[in-house]
Swiss-Prot record:
Keywords associated with the record: Acetylcholine receptor inhibiting toxin, Disulfide bond, Ion channel impairing toxin, Neurotoxin, Postsynaptic neurotoxin, Secreted, Signal, Toxin
Lineage, opening ranks: Eukaryota, Metazoa, Chordata, Craniata, Vertebrata
UniProt function note: Binds with high affinity to muscular (alpha-1/CHRNA1) and neuronal (alpha-7/CHRNA7) nicotinic acetylcholine receptor (nAChR) and inhibits acetylcholine from binding to the receptor, thereby impairing neuromuscular and neuronal transmission.
Taxonomic source organism: Laticauda laticaudata (Blue-ringed sea krait)
Family affiliation: Belongs to the three-finger toxin family. Long-chain subfamily. Type II alpha-neurotoxin sub-subfamily.
Disulfide bonds, paired cysteine numbers: C23-C41, C34-C62, C47-C51, C66-C77, C78-C83
Subcellular location(s) of the protein: Secreted
GO cellular component terms given for this protein: extracellular region
Tissue specificity comment: Expressed by the venom gland.
Annotated protein name in UniProt: Long neurotoxin LlLong
Length: 87
């Protein structure tokens, strides 16, 4: 019985039950837990037709792989909790 309990405890410690990343997400710029498998935070910015009035559009979120920046977009990724604050 003791051996079985020890094995269960060791298994739980080794599995770590899948830590998930915490990133800021838009539209509310809220710190949220990312879905399993999405271990990167990203920040994407671009200009829309109102750029000269209110600045660049900012998108924050979680991702499994860093999104490829399209023309006239800036994209950065990072791998620590809340490493993508609103610029």
């Amino acid at each position: 019985k003791t051996l079985l309990l020890t094995l269960v405890v060791v298994t739980i410690i080794c599995l770590d039950f899948g830590y998930t990343r915490i990133c800021f997400k838009t539209p509310y710029v809220k710190s949220e837990t990312c879905p399993p498998g999405q271990e990167l935070c990203y920040t994407k910015t671009w200009c829309d037709r109102f750029c000269s009035i209110r600045g660049k559009v900012i998108e924050l979120g979680c991702t499994a792989t860093c999104p490829r920046a399209e023309p006239k977009e800036d994209t950065t990724c990072c791998s620590k909790d809340n490493c993508n604050p609103h610029p």
